[in-house]
């Protein structure tokens, strides 16, 4: 039966080879069987520019390109960790870049896709930070810096983010229900798929279904499968 996959929040890095191994297994064995593959952000733990080269980055690019070459339509939506992924990455992998909110029609279902961080409006400090770093002039300036400088800045930002999380409540870091409902109504859908919060679940809410993609952890890959009959669910080992 025809089907598609949705994943997010892998946070791939050279310090966690077990996550890379899970991704390799998925891309070699499951992904080629799909019609479409949607990666909804935070594929990498951080991204400092399309010009960065590493064994991991090249391996991931090659895997996506291979799946794309096998006829799978691949899509990538930016996360809060890899929002600087650009057109060069898209060309080298064959993955189409999507905007922050993307309306799709899949197997006769209208679906709204987003990474999920834009729905967490109660985290005021993060939203202010997000607005700053998404300014195009600031991104252009950052990308002009030497790679070593960009790496140091990214490491400092990541460390501060991890520190800030310790002081924030789980409620603040979750989506705002009223705002999320407004977005769903704005796009006229009854199905929303997002990641970011790392709280894998399928929520039946008033008027729509909200699917939250989980993060990938040692020995567990959060993979949502939707088939042409409209059925969907997380793949369980």
Curated annotation (Swiss-Prot):
An annotated GO BP: lipid A biosynthetic process
Single GO MF annotation: UDP-2,3-diacylglucosamine hydrolase activity
UniProt keyword Lyase present: no
Reactions listed under catalytic activity: UDP-2-N,3-O-bis[(3R)-3-hydroxytetradecanoyl]-alpha-D-glucosamine + H2O = 2-N,3-O-bis[(3R)-3-hydroxytetradecanoyl]-alpha-D-glucosaminyl 1-phosphate + UMP + 2 H(+)
Disulfide bonds: none
CDD domains: MPP_YbbF-LpxH
Annotated pathway: Glycolipid biosynthesis; lipid IV(A) biosynthesis; lipid IV(A) from (3R)-3-hydroxytetradecanoyl-[acyl-carrier-protein] and UDP-N-acetyl-alpha-D-glucosamine: step 4/6
Job description of the protein: Hydrolyzes the pyrophosphate bond of UDP-2,3-diacylglucosamine to yield 2,3-diacylglucosamine 1-phosphate (lipid X) and UMP by catalyzing the attack of water at the alpha-P atom. Involved in the biosynthesis of lipid A, a phosphorylated glycolipid that anchors the lipopolysaccharide to the outer membrane of the cell.
Residues binding Mn(2+) 2, per UniProt: 42, 80, 115, 196
Membrane topology according to the record: Peripheral membrane protein
Residues reported to bind Mn(2+) 1: 9, 11, 42, 198
UniProt gene name: lpxH
Main EC class the enzyme belongs to: hydrolase
Organism listed in the record: Haemophilus influenzae (strain PittGG)
InterPro entries per record: Calcineurin-like_PHP_ApaH, LpxH-like, Metallo-depent_PP-like, UDP-diacylglucosamine_Hdrlase
Cofactor note: Binds 2 Mn(2+) ions per subunit in a binuclear metal center.
Residue sites binding substrate per the record: 80-81, 123, 161, 165, 168, 196
Pfam family, one: Metallophos
UniProt keywords, alphabetically: Cell inner membrane, Cell membrane, Hydrolase, Lipid A biosynthesis, Lipid biosynthesis, Lipid metabolism, Manganese, Membrane, Metal-binding
EC identifiers of the protein: 3.6.1.54
Family: Belongs to the LpxH family.
Cofactor(s) annotated in UniProt: Mn(2+)
Entry-linked SUPFAM superfamilies: Metallo-dependent phosphatases
GO cellular component term, pick one: extrinsic component of plasma membrane
Record's protein name: UDP-2,3-diacylglucosamine hydrolase
Subcellular localization, as worded in the UniProt entry: Cell inner membrane
Signal peptide: none
Residues spanning the membrane: none
């Amino acid at each position: 039966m025809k089907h598609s996959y949705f994943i997010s929040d892998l946070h791939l890095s050279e310090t966690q080879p077990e996550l890379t191994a899970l991704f390799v297994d998925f891309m070699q064995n499951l992904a080629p069987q799909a019609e479409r593959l949607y990666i909804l952000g935070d594929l990498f733990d951080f991204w400092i520019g399309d010009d960065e080269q590493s064994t991991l980055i090249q391996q991931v690019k090659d895997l996506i390109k291979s799946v794309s070459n096998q006829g799978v339509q691949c899509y990538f939506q930016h996360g809060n960790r890899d929002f600087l992924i650009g057109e060069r990455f898209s060309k080298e992998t064959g993955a189409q870049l999507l905007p922050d909110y993307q309306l799709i029609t899949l197997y006769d279902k209208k679906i709204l896709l987003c990474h999920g961080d834009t729905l967490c409006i109660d985290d005021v400090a993060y939203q202010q930070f997000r607005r700053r770093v998404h300014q195009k002039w600031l991104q252009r300036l950052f990308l002009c810096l030497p790679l070593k400088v960009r790496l140091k800045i990214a490491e400092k930002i990541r460390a501060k983010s991890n520190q800030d999380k310790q002081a924030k409540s789980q409620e603040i870091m979750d989506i705002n229900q009223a705002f999320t409902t407004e977005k769903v109504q704005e796009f006229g859908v009854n199905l929303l798929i997002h990641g970011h919060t790392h709280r894998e679940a399928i929520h039946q809410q008033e008027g729509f279904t909200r699917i939250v993609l989980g993060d990938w952890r040692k020995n567990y890959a959060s993979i949502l499968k939707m088939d042409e009959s409209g059925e969907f669910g997380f793949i369980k080992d």
